[in-house]
Amino acid sequence: RDRIRAERITGRKVLGVMPRNSRRYRPFNQQAKEIAMHCLAKALVPYFGREKPVVINILSTEEGDGKHFVAQYLRDYWQKSGLKVGLLSYREEFNCRSESYLLANNLTDYCQVGDAMIVLVVHQPLTEESVPSPLLESANLNLMIARSDRTWTTIDQEVFEKVGEQSGETPLFLVLNQTAWDVTEDFTGLLPPYSRFRRWLYRLSQLGLTARDTKKNESGV
């Protein structure tokens, strides 16, 4: 699944991606992930408020979609920039069935955040347990992690739409995990290795995208 299809199916914007490992370009897998994470982190910044900490809820409909994977990369990226970042997970730092969580109005009602400037909160799979509406509304951002190589079902969409309703005015975006490299390059630009042949292929693909967008605009679609 790519950005265009994901946005058409879900009705929400895809803010970023994380690429799957490439056998062909194995030496560059880590670099590709770091580039993708830089682009995602940069896309998140405009939604940060002035109040601290900035709270970002990391969500998914199913287990194994990559919530912790994305959250850990985000944390490491910002920490390398000198920011204090907290990472809280339903697996260790809080109990999603506890009274303090279920009745919480904001993050500090059920977790200690210390002096963190940014707090990433990884919640339980939403097909198992929902997140209380006040926690979605009080955050700066809600990110739904979805695997690009897994079929998005009717149940996934129903859960996603419910989260959108619960979020109120808090922005809700998709982040696609395990994307193909060509899909990733729609967000990052050309990924390494930067050979002459790959540069030529990339320019060719961009010309194809431009032509397709022009045709859509002319037809009014």
What are these regions (language model features)?
Residues 26, 110-114, 141-145:
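A generic short-segment signal for beta-strand/edge and adjacent turn/coil regions
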Residues 1-84, 90-96, 101, 150-221:
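Short boundary/hinge segments that flank catalytic cores
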Residues 86-138:
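Switch II (G3) loop of P-loop NTPases
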Residues 51-53, 114-117, 139, 169:
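Short, high-confidence coil segments that cap the C-terminus of an alpha-helix
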Residues 57, 118-122, 143-145:
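Structural motif
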